[in-house]
């Protein structure tokens, strides 16, 4: 009886594997050289609005302390 259960589990696992492989095979792929060129182009186009590159104006920074420490 346990061999029948093991066989059923193996078949179910094999079906899941085949389904996953079919899904992965259907994904459209592009060359790394094209993907990296597209990524660099996107970064260059959006660099002017990137706060990590241009910084956040002090007046708009919500994390800046409003007051200085009086104890020091």
Curated annotation (Swiss-Prot):
<dbReference type="GO" id="GO:0005834">
    <property type="term" value="C:heterotrimeric G-protein complex"/>
</dbReference>
<feature type="lipid moiety-binding region" description="S-geranylgeranyl cysteine">
    <location>
        <position position="69"/>
    </location>
</feature>
<comment type="function">
    <text>Guanine nucleotide-binding proteins (G proteins) are involved as a modulator or transducer in various transmembrane signaling systems. The beta and gamma chains are required for the GTPase activity, for replacement of GDP by GTP, and for G protein-effector interaction.</text>
</comment>
<feature type="modified residue" description="Phosphoserine">
    <location>
        <position position="49"/>
    </location>
</feature>
<feature type="modified residue" description="N-acetylserine">
    <location>
        <position position="2"/>
    </location>
</feature>
<comment type="subunit">
    <text>G proteins are composed of 3 units, alpha, beta and gamma.</text>
</comment>
<dbReference type="InterPro" id="IPR001770">
    <property type="entry name" value="Gprotein-gamma"/>
</dbReference>
<dbReference type="Pfam" id="PF00631">
    <property type="entry name" value="G-gamma"/>
</dbReference>
<dbReference type="GO" id="GO:0070062">
    <property type="term" value="C:extracellular exosome"/>
</dbReference>
<feature type="modified residue" description="Cysteine methyl ester">
    <location>
        <position position="69"/>
    </location>
</feature>
<dbReference type="GO" id="GO:0045202">
    <property type="term" value="C:synapse"/>
</dbReference>
<keyword id="KW-0636">Prenylation</keyword>
<keyword id="KW-1003">Cell membrane</keyword>
<dbReference type="GO" id="GO:0007165">
    <property type="term" value="P:signal transduction"/>
</dbReference>
<feature type="modified residue" description="Phosphoserine">
    <location>
        <position position="26"/>
    </location>
</feature>
<keyword id="KW-0449">Lipoprotein</keyword>
<keyword id="KW-0007">Acetylation</keyword>
<dbReference type="InterPro" id="IPR015898">
    <property type="entry name" value="G-protein_gamma-like_dom"/>
</dbReference>
<keyword id="KW-0472">Membrane</keyword>
<protein>
    <recommendedName>
        <fullName>Guanine nucleotide-binding protein G(I)/G(S)/G(O) subunit gamma-12</fullName>
    </recommendedName>
</protein>
<dbReference type="GO" id="GO:0031681">
    <property type="term" value="F:G-protein beta-subunit binding"/>
</dbReference>
<feature type="propeptide" description="Removed in mature form">
    <location>
        <begin position="70"/>
        <end position="72"/>
    </location>
</feature>
<dbReference type="InterPro" id="IPR036284">
    <property type="entry name" value="GGL_sf"/>
</dbReference>
<feature type="modified residue" description="Phosphotyrosine">
    <location>
        <position position="42"/>
    </location>
</feature>
<comment type="similarity">
    <text>Belongs to the G protein gamma family.</text>
</comment>
<keyword id="KW-0807">Transducer</keyword>
<keyword id="KW-0597">Phosphoprotein</keyword>
<dbReference type="GO" id="GO:0005886">
    <property type="term" value="C:plasma membrane"/>
</dbReference>
<dbReference type="GO" id="GO:0007186">
    <property type="term" value="P:G protein-coupled receptor signaling pathway"/>
</dbReference>
<dbReference type="GO" id="GO:0030165">
    <property type="term" value="F:PDZ domain binding"/>
</dbReference>
<keyword id="KW-0488">Methylation</keyword>
